[in-house]
Amino acid sequence: METLTKPEMTVSQKGDKYKVLNVTGAKGAQMPAHISTKEAVVVVLQGEAVLKLHGKEIRLKTNDSAIIPAKAPHTLDIGAHFKADVIMENDSEIQFINP
């Protein structure tokens, strides 16, 4: 059975309404199917990844951004060392679909 390497996520900032998650991952890391309970914005700081959302593959690279709707299942496959900030409301949670 293949071991899945997930990107690391840490909260770097938290304000009155929003928080910023730092997401980092090595080439080949994958974030399995999950949702955010509220809308989220991904801003790529470094690297490349493929966001699979609504049946489409969205190629993300440095300086790209994407808006992920609330409760929309999606995955992230990292193609090159990856760093991104994800901005979401403080009470938003990431929930994996098949943990």
What is the predicted function of each stretch?
Residues M1-A29:
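A short glycine-rich, His/Asp/Glu-containing loop-to-beta-strand
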Residues V11-Q13, N22, Q30-S36, D77-I78, ...:
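Short histidine-centered beta-strand/loop micro-motifs
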Residues S36-V50:
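Short, conserved beta-strand element in jelly-roll/cupin
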Residues L45-Q46, K61-T62, A80:
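A cytosolic small-molecule/anion-sensing beta-strand core signal
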Residues K52-K56, G79:
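Short strand-coil-strand connectors
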Residues G55-A70:
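Short acidic-glycine-tyrosine-enriched beta hairpin
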Residues A70-I94:
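Ligand-binding loop in jelly-roll beta-barrel domains
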